[in-house]
């Protein structure tokens, strides 16, 4: 436990909160940064979009961004699918997240310009930019930002409110 910083604890039994507590200075009303939890929300948005027949997990990534492709599209980039992004097996080695997320350029264009050295779908490599690309794809096919798209489909039905979503 020494390596973890706990802010709260909640015990749920039979679907009801039976106990909860917070360590100062944290409290129920304080918003917490969720970091990689957003990956779960993004993949849920992809699932809704698939259900609504707006996209398929077998769609190629490049099909969504014809105006942002590099001059030369490698065979591996051409075969990268939504499923490869979901499973973090896009084939980019090393993970381009740090380089792209600190740039001031077009992140989609930079992701697509990153060399795909491994066949997509064959090797897992943690890649937060893959989640960013999923978000960009959902925004492209729905015309809405992820939080706006999820609001009526997920957040409101579950009573999730008061959230901030970094764009």
Question: Where do the model's predicted regions map?
Answer:
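Active-site helix/loop module of the DD-peptidase/beta-lactamase fold
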Residues: 33, 52-90, 113, 142-167
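A short, well-structured edge-of-sheet supersecondary motif
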Residues: 1-26
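Aromatic- and histidine-enriched alpha-helix N-cap/loop-to-helix transition segments
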Residues: 35-41, 77-80, 125-132
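Solvent-exposed coil/turn segments that connect beta secondary-structure elements
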Residues: 16, 90-91
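Surface-exposed patches in mature extracellular/periplasmic domains of secreted proteins
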Residues: 6-8, 57-58, 97-98, 165
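Extracellular/periplasmic catalytic domains that process cell-envelope and extracellular macromolecules
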Residues: 2-4, 25-26, 56, 76-80, ...
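Catalytic-site signature segments of enzymes, centered on catalytic residues
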Residues: 28-29, 92-167
């Amino acid at each position: 436990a020494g390596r973890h910083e706990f802010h709260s604890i909640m015990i749920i039994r039979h679907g009801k909160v039976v106990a909860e507590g917070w360590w100062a200075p944290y409290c129920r009303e304080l918003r917490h940064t969720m970091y990689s939890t957003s990956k779960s929300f993004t993949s849920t948005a992809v699932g809704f979009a698939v259900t609504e027949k707006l996209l398929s997990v077998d769609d190629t990534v490049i099909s969504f961004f014809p105006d942002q492709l590099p001059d030369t599209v490698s065979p591996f980039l051409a075969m990268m699918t939504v499923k490869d992004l979901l499973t973090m097996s896009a084939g980019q080695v090393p993970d381009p997240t740090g380089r792209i997320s600190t740039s001031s350029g077009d992140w989609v264009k930079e992701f697509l310009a990153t060399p795909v050295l491994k066949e997509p779908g064959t090797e897992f490599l943690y890649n937060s930019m893959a989640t960013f690309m999923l978000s960009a794809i959902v925004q492209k096919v729905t015309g809405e930002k992820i939080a706006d798209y999820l609001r009526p489909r997920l957040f409101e039905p579950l009573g999730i409110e008061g959230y901030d979503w970094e764009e």
